[in-house]
């Protein structure tokens, strides 16, 4: 599991997701009347799910940690939010100010990250942009950037990393993800330049770029959107996908769900 000592199989045998949902419903932390993709409510799906191992699925009154597993950060670098997984982060980096080392794409990252001449040290903040829902259609799991080889050789095992991409739920590191709005649509991440100072303050839920507002506006005026596909499904996707803070759904589907879809069984006995 992302946090704790148990495996995914242990979670399943302990009752699984619906057991967690039922506990949250009983604690009145979820609205059980909301509909889900199968046309049933959250409460209906949870049904009579039980917890069979309280060491794996802890009760709400005795959580694994005092704080939640996800921290939502906001600031001038992420006006609509970004997320970080504190349980996977390094405690010493949860309050950190560092110099930005910027990669404009995943290709740029792979081309330069292990260059011995790259100006980067353990205090730097790695920034990977144009990897969000529009910049890298599908929002690939590339946010947990591997550290530079020369720093790994010196024993560095974690650094602050910021991206509009996502990462696997079982990945580790002090990684800020899902920055919204993303760089490809002109979000502030697009305006970060090499050497800019960035502040990460997890306790304060802040993510700030220490650049004068006037300078940021000058950069905004000079910014140009990166090229994107103009045909086929990819073009449709880029045109209609919403940002990470809105679930990366299609804009034309918002408000159009809520009922079960009738279907004929293909199996007749």
Segments the model singles out, each with a brief description of its role:
Residues 1-182, 187-266:
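Catalytic or ion-coupling anion/metal-binding cores of large enzyme and transporter domains
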């Amino acid at each position: 599991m992302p946090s704790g000592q148990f495996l995914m199989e242990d979670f399943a045998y302990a009752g699984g997701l619906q057991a967690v949902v039922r506990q949250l419903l009983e604690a009145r932390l979820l609205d059980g009347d909301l509909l889900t993709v199968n046309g049933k409510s959250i409460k209906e799906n949870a049904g009579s799910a039980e917890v069979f191992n309280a060491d794996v699925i802890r009760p709400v009154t005795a959580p694994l940690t005092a704080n939640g597993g996800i921290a939502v950060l906001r600031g001038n670098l992420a006006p609509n939010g970004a997320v970080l997984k504190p349980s996977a982060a390094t405690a010493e980096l949860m309050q950190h100010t560092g110099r930005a080392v910027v990669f404009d794409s995943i290709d740029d990252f792979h081309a330069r990250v292990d260059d011995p001449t790259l100006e980067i040290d353990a205090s730097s903040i790695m920034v990977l942009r144009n990897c969000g829902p529009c910049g890298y259609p599908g929002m690939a799991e590339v946010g947990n950037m591997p550290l530079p080889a020369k720093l790994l050789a010196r024993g560095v095992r974690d650094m602050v990393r910021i991206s509009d991409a996502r990462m696997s739920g079982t990945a580790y590191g002090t990684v800020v993800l899902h920055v919204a709005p993303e760089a490809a649509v002109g979000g502030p991440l697009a305006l970060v330049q090499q050497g800019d100072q960035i502040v990460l303050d997890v306790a304060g839920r802040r993510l700030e770029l220490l650049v004068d507002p006037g300078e940021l506006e000058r950069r905004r005026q000079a910014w140009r959107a990166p090229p994107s596909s103009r045909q086929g499904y990819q073009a449709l996707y880029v045109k209609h996908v919403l940002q990470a803070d809105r679930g990366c759904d299609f804009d034309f589907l918002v408000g159009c769900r809520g009922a079960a879809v009738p279907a004929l069984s293909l199996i007749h006995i």
